[in-house]
Amino acid sequence: NISTDEIFAGKKVLLFAVPGAFTPGCTLTHLPGYVVNADKIKAKGVDTIACMAVNDAFVMDAWGKSQNAEELLMLGDGNGDFTAALGLELDGTGFGLGKRSQRFAMLVDDGTVTHLNVEPSSADSMMALL
């Protein structure tokens, strides 16, 4: 377990979320933009780039390793509690996915959300805000 204070306190964090680890769109399109641009994003003053999905921590760790995402903090929102608290749930029950997260990205400065993009939330769209 990791607390939100551990992630956000005293830091500038770019947190992005995807509906699910290992899903085609997230794996082929969304995550790679952040992996490729991690150095550029950090050069603009971001301390931590975090990727979150409503998956368990083990799945997120395996997905991060499979995608060479060593520069990213891979976070599992196992029960979707954080996602629900943000009001950014996606109902994927019709596709057999259960409750998931919408695709979004936010900039958080010392625990305060300064920008929130919900589709589009690509690395390019977030870099334009830095």
Predicted regions, residues:
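Chalcogenol-based redox active-site neighborhoods
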Residues: 1-130
